[in-house]
């Protein structure tokens, strides 16, 4: 069993294959979060902030970036900033609720993602203190390092769209994410949307909560991992079913 990066996950799988040892890999990816026209901008923003910035963005199922309907983009950004101030105050560096980055190496990686980006909010960091301010970025192209690699930190890129053909094109750039989310007041559409793409697990009108349900299996698919665990699935993952029969003589 391994939890970590795709790069190391491949190494683990290669080494396990030498011994024909089965593995469960819980990896990651760029988890998209689509914001259609939700019933409540306030609740949507609150749930995005919680899911994205918990543990300073260092969770494998955090929304990596938002794909937002142009009609509500400005309202949503304004409310996300408001919810950030409510969660971590206007000075997150002084908030006991706001975390720190795991290492100086990761700080250097995150700071490199900001190069040549349009910062809408935040962007300040202190490598020595391992502090990285909650940051919102407006995305106009997908060629940057920020939009090619998993972030795993408190940087939230926002991409706008006008129609779902654009959303489809964007999502297909990032195959097999570990998680996918959509906020919409049309639940039937939300279900149909999530059923259209391969990913590990997700939610409609929330983020990350699926990991807390011990009746749901948790795991990735393709580049985001293989195998599953949680609840009954954990016993199955760490067990070998050894069938046999007994017949009378």
What residue ranges belong to the model's regions?
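N-terminal Rossmann-like NAD(P) cofactor-binding module of classical short-chain dehydrogenase/reductase
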Residues: 1
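Conserved C-terminal structural/oligomerization subdomain of aldehyde/semialdehyde dehydrogenase
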Residues: 34, 131-249
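ALDH superfamily catalytic-core signature
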Residues: 4-142, 204
């Amino acid at each position: 069993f391994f939890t970590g990066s795709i790069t190391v996950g491949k190494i683990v799988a290669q080494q396990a294959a030498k011994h024909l040892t089965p593995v469960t890999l819980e990896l990651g990816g760029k988890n998209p979060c689509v914001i259609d026209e939700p019933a409540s901008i306030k609740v949507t923003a609150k749930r995005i902030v919680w899911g994205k910035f918990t543990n300073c963005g260092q969770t494998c199922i955090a929304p990596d970036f938002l794909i937002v309907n142009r009609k509500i983009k400005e309202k949503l950004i304004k409310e996300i900033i408001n919810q950030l101030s409510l969660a971590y105050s206007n000075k997150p560096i002084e908030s006991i609720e706001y975390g720190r980055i795991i290492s100086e190496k990761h700080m250097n990686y995150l700071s490199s993602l900001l190069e040549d980006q349009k910062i809408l909010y935040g962007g300040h960091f202190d490598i020595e203190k391992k502090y990285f301010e909650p940051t919102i970025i407006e995305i106009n192209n997908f060629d940057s390092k920020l939009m090619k690699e998993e972030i795993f930190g408190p940087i939230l890129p926002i991409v706008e769209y006008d129609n779902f053909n654009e959303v489809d094109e964007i999502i297909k750039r990032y195959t097999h994410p570990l998680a996918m989310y959509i906020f919409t007041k049309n639940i039937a559409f939300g279900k149909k949307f999530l059923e259209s793409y391969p990913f590990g697990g997700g939610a409609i009108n929330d983020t990350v909560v699926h990991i807390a349900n011990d009746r749901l299996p948790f795991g990735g698919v393709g580049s985001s991992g293989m195998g599953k665990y949680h609840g009954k699935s954990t016993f199955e993952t760490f067990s070998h079913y050894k069938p046999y029969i007994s017949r009378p003589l």
